[in-house]
Amino acid sequence: MSQAINIRQLHVVVDAPAEAVFDFVSDLRNLPAWAVHFCKGIRLVADGAIVTAPSGEMYFGTTGDRDLGVLDWWAGPTMEKAQRWPTRIVPVGNRSLYTVTMIFGEHVPPAVEQHLSEELANLKRLVEAREGATAAA
């Protein structure tokens, strides 16, 4: 069994407070709107969701601490076998730096960085639009 580990890290700067980013990402009902390559469908369950991904159905959930900006993603065939991808939300003035660390074994899926980069751009657009609508109200 290989002990290979491959780490990839991506980030996005969002023109919104860290709390707004945390709230948006931790609400799994928002996942299909921004994670368009990963989430083709979603069914909410206790402590997470069953996501229809390109590879089939899988568990997806989050754990975190809003005040600390810690929001970890958990994904796998079941909740018990889910693996963690740590994400962090750091306030930068009135903006937020959202960083996702992807952890793979020997195999890194093709185009995963491109896909997640596009998804983070979607997340940025949606959070900023929501914050703009909130500020205008």
Predicted features by range, described:
Residues 74-137:
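Beta-strand/loop substructures that line and gate deep hydrophobic ligand-binding cavities in soluble
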